[in-house]
Every structure is written in structure tokens, then in C-alpha cells.
Amino acid sequence: MKTLLGKIQVPDNVFSGIRGRSYSDNARLHLGKSKRNLYKIDLTSFFPSISRETVYRFFFEALCCSPDVAELLTNLTTVDLKKLNQSNLLEVYDFLANKGVKCYNHLISGAPTSQILSYLVNHKMFDELQSLSDKNNVTMTVYVDDVIFSSEHKISSEFRQSVLSLIKKYNYQVSRKKVKGYSKTYPKLVTGVIINSEGKATIKNALRKKIMVEYEYLQNNPADIKSRQRLRGLITAARQIDKSAGHSQILCKVQWVQE
């Protein structure tokens, strides 16, 4: 089903489970020759807040599926907590209640179809956010529950409030702790990528440290195949962020593991 959903055309600034698009591509849209102000928000408990009814309406109305087909597809992509026989179900209820989520029949967290569906079933909300951004000369990207806005100009408090009001209109909540604004010269963290004070993507220090720790371990345990694979994966992740990272001192030290 993910393959079929992936055939639906979505805007170029959407990176929610889209084949060929990654978290680093999402951050890259906020780079540029000039430094940019940035404003980012996180939708609280996004998947559990996407109700079965919302998913059903998408299949029935947007994709014009028959009622029985829409019902089947909804059953495959949502979960009803009340039908699950779990010993810790009360703990789950309490957790969701503390997050302000009142929906117990919702999009499945972790399912391969959920990321793309989280955008598709809410495309009207994201379209409105995009329209608002266009009117204010703001660049917007969507990576699942992370919505990022950037501009060469100041991002006004009026714009920020309009964003929050629009999201509230669609019955979603924003994690206040994860709402952040950055000035042009301040380093920014965007979906795991650091945008430095010069407006360029750089590798997080935590990733550099992981590479060095794994490299040192592999030097002492050269026959450890899993360590070799982990190191290769870390290098690949670093190069997704900064393609020139392969020439840095850190990554040159581990170049041999890719031979």
C-alpha cells in the first residue's frame, strides 16, 4: 500500500515518507546564499491525533474509494486501542491523556504507510499553511510532525500566531517546548541537521563522536562485521548531510571500511 500511496503527487517541500527524499533534503531547503531566520514547530502526538474518521474520509472522499474499500483500507492503516488485549492499556490511556489526545482509534505509529498518510489525510491543513507562507515570503517544509519555516526577512509574531491558530483549527496541538525561533546568525537544528551561522549544513558533534568511537572499536576488533556495518552507516548518514564530509579528517580515517 505504501508503494501505491507513493504514486500520489505531493509538493516538493514535503518529506514525510516520500521515496527519494530524506531528513537532510528537508533541511537543505532552508539553506541558501543568504542567511535565514527560522521558526520550527512540532505537532504533539501527531499519529495518535489522526483519527480513524480522518483516514476514512481521505480514502472515501479524496481517493473516491467505495465505502467498503475505504473501510478496508482504514482498518489496515489504523489501530483501535479499545480492541487490543493489553495488560498496560490503562498506562497507554494515561499517557495519551497527558498528551491531550482523546482519540483511541487512530493512525498506527511505526507502520510503513503512516508517514505519507499523515500528510495526505491532512493536506488541506498543510495547503493552508503553505498559502500563508507564500503570502509572507516564507519557505515551508513538512517532515512528518516537524513543520519548518524560514525566511531572509524577520518572521513576525503575527505569522507565528496565524500558524498556531490554523493548526488548532484542525484540532491538532503544538508542543510548546519544541516551538523554536532562530535568528539569522544563530546555529539551527533542523530534522537532525545543524545549519551553522553561515547558513551551511554541518554534521552534529554527536554524529562525529559516534563515528570516532565506532572507528576506535573497530581498530581493536577488525573482525567485527556488525561494527563495520554500523560505521559504514554512520559515514553514509554524515555524507547525506555534508557531501564534502568524506574529505574531513574524521571520515578520512575510516575510508578504508568501505573498500
Predicted regions and their residues:
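Short acidic donor-binding/metal-coordinating loop in glycosyltransferase active sites
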Residues: 43, 144-145
